[in-house]
């Protein structure tokens, strides 16, 4: 399976471990970054993962930031994405079987790597169970998505990147 993976600078090592694990399981990975610990922001990488999945370049996605909250919210803004922030196998399976989630998010500083791998395995093994009720819920959720023209601009994050270059952000 082709899986897009992305993270922010806080959890780069955790993302690398997930990528390595998925490769050992025979999956093809689209590594959307980030690739080091240089300060950045999660929306950039959530957007990249979301676009890879929504375009069909990847079948599913995994996003990771410190708590998982920010990057999961960011990836959910990409039209066609249904992402779930998960911390256990039950939630991951539910998100796939009932809501047809195509991205899962993790808090890399909240959950350990081995558990994260187990949850990813459970998510990948789960299959969407289409029912009339599930289809209605998904249609309702999807109807809430409206892409803005600004979002398609390749310079969408430039103002923030310029601030980082000027040293205006501090951890």
Swiss-Prot record:
Its EC number is 5.3.1.26. InterPro entries: LacB, RpiB_LacA_LacB, RpiB_LacA_LacB_sf. It catalyses: aldehydo-D-galactose 6-phosphate = keto-D-tagatose 6-phosphate. Gene3D superfamilies: Sugar-phosphate isomerase, RpiB/LacA/LacB. GO terms for molecular function: galactose-6-phosphate isomerase activity; ribose-5-phosphate isomerase activity. One of its GO terms (biological process) is lactose catabolic process via tagatose-6-phosphate. The keyword Glycoprotein does not apply. Keywords: Isomerase, Lactose metabolism. It holds the Pfam family LacAB_rpiB. It is an enzyme of class 5 (isomerase). Coiled coil: none annotated. Pathway: Carbohydrate metabolism; D-galactose 6-phosphate degradation; D-tagatose 6-phosphate from D-galactose 6-phosphate: step 1/1. PANTHER family: DNA DAMAGE-REPAIR_TOLERATION PROTEIN DRT102, RIBOSE-5-PHOSPHATE ISOMERASE B. Belongs to the LacAB/RpiB family. Heteromultimeric protein consisting of LacA and LacB. This is Galactose-6-phosphate isomerase subunit LacB 2. The lineage of its organism: Bacteria, Bacillati, Bacillota, Bacilli, Lactobacillales. The gene is lacB2.
């Amino acid at each position: 399976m082709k899986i897009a993976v992305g993270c922010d600078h806080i959890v780069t090592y955790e993302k690398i471990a997930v990528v390595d694990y998925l490769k050992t399981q025979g999956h093809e990975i689209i590594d959307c970054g980030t690739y080091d610990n240089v300060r950045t922001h999660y929306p950039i990488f959530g957007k990249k993962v979301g676009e890879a999945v929504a375009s069909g370049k990847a079948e599913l996605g995994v996003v990771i930031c410190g708590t998982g909250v920010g990057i999961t919210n960011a990836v959910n803004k990409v039209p066609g994405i249904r992402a779930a922030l998960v911390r256990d196998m039950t939630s991951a399976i539910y998100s796939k079987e009932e809501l047809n989630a195509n991205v899962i998010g993790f808090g890399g500083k909240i959950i350990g790597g081995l558990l994260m791998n187990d949850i990813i395995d459970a998510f990948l093994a789960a299959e969407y169970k289409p029912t009339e009720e599930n289809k209605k819920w998904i249609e309702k959720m999807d109807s809430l998505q409206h892409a803005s023209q600004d979002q398609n601009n390749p310079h969408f994050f430039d103002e923030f990147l310029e601030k980082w270059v000027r040293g205006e952000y501090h951890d």
